[in-house]
UniProtKB/Swiss-Prot annotation:
One of its GO terms (biological process) is monoatomic ion transmembrane transport. One of its GO terms (cellular component) is membrane. It comes from Arabidopsis thaliana. The keyword Membrane applies. It comes from the Eukaryota. This is Mechanosensitive ion channel protein 7.
Length: 849
C-alpha cells in the first residue's frame, strides 16, 4: 500500500524526484486500476491492501476503543513514522500484516428467492473480510449483479453501525489525537499554514487582518483603509448634491425663498431631508477626520484606534441622530408648534431623543465589552501566544534549508564574481577554469532556488510581522490590532514544516504538510534532527543552529531543550520531547482561545439583551406609555421573575466573574480537585468539562468550582518531589552516609532532569527498627506532564535500589530476643508424666510449637 510520508518534499533542497520516477508511479497506479476480479482475490489472499475510503471508515471502530483506553498522556500511537526509506519499508510490511489480522468485518444478509416462484426461502449470513474499499466494492458489485440476474434481493443492514459510529465520534476528546484515517479524511477542513520564513509571521489573506508595521498605518487593517463605495453610499452622495443645489436655489431665488409647504418654508423641509438622508454620510466624514488625527499620534494609535474602529458605526449613528435632533429642534420651534397646534411635532421630538439615547447606550455597551475583552486577552494569553509563535517559527526554520549559511555563501560568490569582473575589465588574463568556477551555469528547472522562491504569499504592500517586532512586543506596548491578529494566527494556522511551501506546485496530499498529532510531531522531530545535525553526529550544537538562526535566536533556542544549557548540546530525545510539548501547548492554546471567544460572544449577547431591556424601559418612560398602574404591574412582574430566576442570575454572574476575572485554569491544564487529578477539556460560562485519567468526562458547574481549592500544575513553577526508602536500625552509619553521597552524586549527574544539591536526610524512625530515608529533589519541570515526572522518578528509584543492593542492604527480619517467665501449672490428664517434673523441657516444647 502507499505509505504516507508527512514531511517528504519532492522539491526540497536535499532530494529531487525526477520525471521518470513520477511516470513510473503513474504506470503502477494504472496497472492497479486495471486489475480484474481474479487479481483482486489474489491480492487479498496475499495480504496486500489498498488505501481506500472503506478501509478508513471501518478502521475507525477498531481504533476508537484503543483511543479511549489511553492514559493521561494519551499515548494512543505506539508506532512512529520514520523518514528513512528502509525504515519506512519495514514498517509498511508490519502495518500490512497487522491490518490483515485485525481487518474490519462487514456482515451482509442475503435472502434467496427461488426462481420457480415457490415460497421456499433460505437465508445465509456471510462475513467477508474487506481490507480495502477497492476490492470489497468490486466484489460487492459483481455479487449484486449476479444476484440480480438470478432474481435475488439484497438487503443491507447498516443502520446500527452508522448510529454507533456517530455516537462514538461525538464522545471523542479534543485533547486526544484523532485516528490517522480521520486525519486523512478531514484534512481539507484545516487551513494550511503560511510560512514564517525569514522571520515573518505567516497569515491568511482572507481570515487575518494584515498590517504594515513600518508605516504610519501599522495598526489599521487593509479593509479599514479602503473607502467602501456601495449603492447606498452612491445614492447618498447623489442626494447630497441634489439637496445642496435645491437649498442654494431656494435661498438664492426670491420666488422660492417665500415658498411654503404645509405652512412651512420650503428650505426648512430641504434642510430636514438633507440631515435625514445625508447626515450619516456627513458624520462618516467627520469620523474619518477624527481617525486621521488619532493615527498621527503614536500613543493614541497604539491604544485607542482599535476601539475607535470598533465603535465607529455606533459613533457615526450618534452624530447622525444628534444632527437630526438639532435640526428638528431649531427648525420646528415652539412658534411652529403653536401655529400648527399638533402633538405630532412633540412626539417626533421624543422619538428622536429615544433613538439618540438608545444609540448612546449601545455605544457604551460595545465599548465596554471590547475594552474588557481586549484587556483580558492581553493579560492572560499574550505571553503564551508569543512563545507559541516563536516555537512555530523555529519548527519551520529548522526544517528548511540553512538560509543564513546559503546567504553567506552566495554573498561570498557575489563578491568573488565582482572581483573577477573587475579584473577582466582591467585587462587581466584569467583562465577559463577560474571563470567557469566563479560563474556556474544555471540550475535545471527541476531544482528549486530557495532564495528567490515565492516562500511568503504577499498581498498589496503588507510585509507581515517580523520576529524582531514580535520579541519587542509586551503586554504594555502591544496594540489591540496586533493582539487580534496573533490570536487569529494561533486559532487558524496549524503547525507545519517548511516542506509545505516547497510542495505547493506538487500533487501530494495537502494533509501531509502539517503537524496534527503527536505521531507526526515525532516524525517532524526526526526530520529536523537530520536536517540540522552534522552527518554522523548524535547531537546538535550551537554552531549547527547558527546555520539557520541568528546568534540571539540560537542562544534562546538552546534554553528551550532539557539539559542543553548545561551540556551545550541537544539530543534527539530532547528535540522530540520539545516538539511534542510544543504541539500540545499549541493545541491547548488554540482550544482555549476558541472557548474564550465563544464565551465572550455569549457574554456579549447577554449584555445586549440587558441593554435592549433598558432601552425599552426608556422608550416607555419618555413616550409616557407607562402609566402608574402599568409601572406597578411591571414592578410586580419583575419581583415575580426575580423570585423565580434570581438564583439563576446570581449563578450566571458569579460564573462570569469566576471565568473572566479569577480564571484559575485554561484548556489542557492539569488540576487537582478534591484529590482527583483531571485535565481541562472545555470551558464554558456556566460549566467546565474535565477529563479524568481514564478518559472519563466530568462536568463541574463553575459556581461549585468557585468554592473548591484548585491545584493547577501547569501554572506552577518547577516542582519538587519526594522519594523515600527504609533501612534497618542496625545499619551502620557509614553505609547510610554512603547512601546519601551516592544518591546526591547521581542527582547531580543528571542536570537535565533535576536541580543539583538535593536533600537526602534521615526522616523518621518507625517501631524502633526501621529508619526512613527521604530524598527531596526539585525537577526542572512542573507536574503538568505527569508521565515525564514518573519516568524521571522511576530512574531515581531504580538507582536507589541499585545502590542498596551494592551496599548489601536488604529488607529482612533480624532475630528477636524472647524472655519466657515461670509458667503456671497445667492441670490435665493428657499431660506426660515428665512434664510437671521438668519445667525446662516444657519451655522447649512450647517454643518449638
Amino acid at each position: 500500500m502507499e505509505f504516507r510520508k508527512p514531511f517528504k518534499s519532492h522539491s526540497s533542497y536535499k532530494q529531487i524526484i525526477s520525471t521518470g520516477d513520477q511516470n513510473e508511479k503513474t504506470k503502477k497506479k494504472k496497472k492497479l486500476a486495471n486489475l480484474d476480479d481474479g487479481d483482486i482475490a489474489k491480492t487479498q489472499s496475499s495480504g496486500s491492501s489498498f488505501d481506500g475510503n472503506s478501509y478508513k471508515f471501518w478502521q475507525d471502530i477498531a481504533t476508537d476503543d484503543y483511543t479511549k483506553s489511553g492514559s493521561f498522556d494519551f499515548p494512543q500511537y505506539r508506532e512512529e513514522i520514520t523518514l528513512d526509506v528502509n525504515e519506512e519499508t519495514e514498517e509498511t510490511e508490519d502495518v500490512s500484516n497487522n491490518n490483515n489480522l485485525s481487518g474490519s468485518k462487514e456482515t451482509r444478509v442475503f435472502f434467496k428467492i427461488n426462481s420457480s416462484g415457490t415460497n421456499n426461502m433460505s437465508g445465509s449470513v456471510r462475513s467477508c473480510t474487506s481490507s480495502t474499499s477497492f476490492s470489497s466494492a468490486t466484489m460487492r458489485l459483481n455479487l449484486e449483479q449476479q444476484l440480480e440476474d438470478e432474481g435475488e434481493v439484497v438487503v443491507r443492514c447498516s443502520s446500527v453501525r452508522k448510529t454507533e459510529l456517530v455516537s462514538r465520534a461525538k464522545a471523542r476528546s479534543r485533547l486526544i489525537d484523532p485516528p490517522q484515517e480521520e486525519e486523512q479524511q478531514y484534512s481539507s477542513w484545516i487551513g494550511t499554514s503560511d510560512q514564517l520564513r525569514s522571520g515573518l509571521l505567516g497569515r491568511h489573506s482572507d481570515d487575518i487582518e494584515e498590517e504594515d508595521d513600518s508605516s504610519a498605518e501599522e495598526d489599521v487593517p487593509v479593509e479599514y483603509r479602503k473607502l467602501k463605495m456601495d449603492a447606498i453610499t452612491l445614492l447618498q452622495w447623489m442626494s447630497l448634491i441634489a439637496l445642496v443645489v435645491a437649498l442654494v436655489l431656494s435661498l438664492g431665488l426670491h420666488t422660492w425663498r417665500n415658498a411654503t409647504l404645509w405652512s412651512l418654508h420650503l428650505w426648512k423641509w430641504e434642510v430636514v431631508l438633507l440631515v435625514l438622508i445625508c447626515g450619516r454620510l456627513v458624520s462618516g466624514c467627520g469620523i474619518r477626520i477624527i481617525v486621521f488625527f488619532i493615527e498621527r499620534n503614536f500613543l493614541l494609535r497604539k491604544r485607542v484606534l482599535y476601539f475607535v474602529y470598533g465603535v465607529k458605526t455606533a459613533v457615526q449613528n450618534c452624530l447622525w441622530l444628534g444632527l437630526v435632533l438639532l435640526a428638528w429642534h431649531f427648525l420646528f420651534d415652539k412658534k411652529v408648534e403653536k401655529e400648527t397646534q399638533s402633538d405630532v411635532l412633540l412626539l417626533m421630538s421624543k422619538i428622536l431623543v429615544c433613538f439618540l439615547l438608545s444609540t448612546v447606550l449601545w455605544l457604551i455597551k460595545t465599548l465596554v465589552v471590547k475594552v474588557l475583552a481586549s484587556s483580558f486577552h492581553v493579560s492572560t494569553y499574550f505571553d503564551r501566544i508569543q512563545e507559541a509563535l516563536f516555537h512555530h517559527y523555529l519548527i519551520e526554520t529548522l526544517s528548511g534549508p540553512p538560509m543564513l549559511e546559503l546567504s553567506r555563501i552566495e554573498e561570498e560568490e557575489d563578491r568573488t564574481q565582482d572581483e573577477i569582473y573587475k579584473m577582466q575589465k582591467g585587462g587581466a588574463d584569467l583562465s577559463p577554469e577560474l571563470c567557469s568556477a566563479a560563474f556556474p551555469q544555471e540550475k535545471s528547472g527541476s531544482t528549486m532556488n530557495m532564495k528567490f522562491s515565492p516562500i511568503i504569499p504577499k498581498t498589496g504592500s503588507d510585509n507581515g510581522i517580523t520576529m524582531d517586532d514580535l520579541h519587542k512586543m509586551n503586554q504594555k506596548n502591544v496594540s489591540a490590532w496586533n493582539m487580534k491578529r496573533l490570536m487569529k494566527i494561533v486559532r487558524n494556522v496549524s503547525l507545519s514544516t517548511l516542506d509545505e511551501q516547497a510542495l505547493q506546485n506538487t500533487c501530494e496530499d495537502e494533509s501531509t504538510r502539517q503537524i496534527r498529532s503527536e505521531k507526526e510531531a515525532k516524525a517532524a522531530a526526526r526530520k529536523i534532527f537530520k536536517n540540522v545535525a552534522q552527518p554522523g553526529t548524535k547531537h546538535i550544537y550551537l554552531e549547527d543552529l547558527m546555520r539557520f538562526l541568528r546568534v540571539d535566536e540560537a542562544m534562546k533556542t538552546m534554553c528551550l531543550f532539557e539539559g542543553a544549557l548545561v551540556t551545550k548540546k541537544i539530543t534527539k530525545s530532547a528535540l522530540k520531547n520539545w516538539l511534542v510539548n510544543a504541539f500540545r501547548e499549541r493545541r491547548a492554546l488554540a482550544l482555549t482561545l476558541n472557548d474564550t471567544k465563544t464565551a465572550v460572544n455569549k457574554l456579549h449577547h447577554m449584555i445586549s439583551f440587558l441593554t435592549a431591556i433598558v432601552i425599552i424601559v426608556i422608550w416607555l418612560i419618555l413616550l409616557e406609555i407607562a402609566t402608574s398602574k402599568y409601572l406597578l404591574f411591571l414592578t410586580s412582574q419583575v419581583v415575580l421573575l426575580a423570585f423565580m430566576f434570581g438564583n439563576s442570575l446570581k449563578t450566571v454572574f458569579e460564573s462570569i466573574i469566576f471565568l473572566f476575572i479569577i480564571h484559575p485554569y485554561d484548556v489542557g491544564d492539569r488540576l487537582l480537585i478534591d484529590t482527583v487529578e483531571m485535565v481541562v477539556e472545555e470551558m464554558n460560562i456556566l460549566t467546565t468539562v474535565f477529563l479524568r485519567a481514564d478518559n472519563l468526562k466530568i462536568v463541574y458547574p463553575n459556581i461549585l468550582l468557585w468554592q473548591k481549592a484548585i491545584h493547577n500544575y501547569n501554572r506552577s513553577p518547577d516542582m519538587g518531589d519526594e522519594v523515600t526508602c527504609c533501612v534497618h536500625i542496625t545499619t551502620p552509619p557509614e553505609k547510610i552516609a554512603a547512601i546519601k553521597q551516592r544518591i546526591s552524586s547521581y542527582i547531580d549527574s543528571k542536570p537535565e532532569y533535576w536541580y543539583p544539591k538535593a536533600d537526602v536526610i534521615v526522616k523518621d524512625v518507625e517501631d524502633l527498627n526501621i529508619v526512613r530515608i527521604a530524598i527531596w529533589l526539585c525537577h526542572k519541570i512542573n507536574h503538568q506532564n505527569m508521565g515525564e515526572r514518573f519516568t524521571r522518578r522511576a530512574l531515581l528509584i531504580e538507582e536507589v535500589i541499585k545502590i542498596l543492593l551494592e551496599l548489601d542492604i536488604q529488607y529482612r527480619f533480624h532475630p528477636l530476643d524472647i524472655n519466657v517467665k515461670t509458667m503456671p501449672t497445667v492441670v490435665s490428664s493428657r499431660v506426660p508424666p515428665a512434664w510437671s517434673q521438668n519445667p525446662d523441657l516444657r519451655r522447649i516444647i512450647l517454643l518449638e510449637c
